[in-house]
């Protein structure tokens, strides 16, 4: 927002405007309060479908692949991220984003419900919304679909 000339186009994936967002179901949020999923791979495998939706609900190979790649984060860093989500919001200045913006979101995203993508698209001028039939981790579960579409948007 401060230097729009530095950004020709913007792509926002599986995100919200911050604290003013429509939250996921409380049972999902309860699983996110702790960094346990980053520390306990069996726990991650058990909750991945509920937490991330999409292919994580139906494809055990995707769940295993994700659980094996996840890096442990520091508790401090994790809680700072939660704090940022709780107190920071971009809602009041989204209208100042002037460059063409592609908003990509999964229709089955339990963490950040799709209504949040619709809010972003309604508040950002020149925004295009691509609501996909997938979950929160579509960049990992569907890279062969997502990457070319993003490339096409950026090349326009």
PLM segments and residue spans:
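Flexible "cap/lid" loop of the alpha/beta hydrolase fold
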Residues: 1-2, 7-37
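Active-site acidic short loop of glycosyltransferases
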Residues: 4-5, 98-99, 126
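Hydrophobic/aromatic beta-strand patches that form the interior of the parallel beta-sheet core
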Residues: 11, 102-104, 130
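Conserved alpha/beta-hydrolase catalytic His-Asp/Glu region
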Residues: 21, 41-93
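Residue-level signal for the nucleotide or nucleotide-sugar donor/cofactor binding architecture
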Residues: 73, 112, 141
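Short beta-strand/loop motif that positions the catalytic acidic residue
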Residues: 97, 103-105, 109
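Conserved alpha/beta-hydrolase "acid-adjacent" motif
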Residues: 110-116
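Catalytic active-site module of serine/aspartate enzymes centered on a nucleophile-bearing elbow/loop
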Residues: 127-156
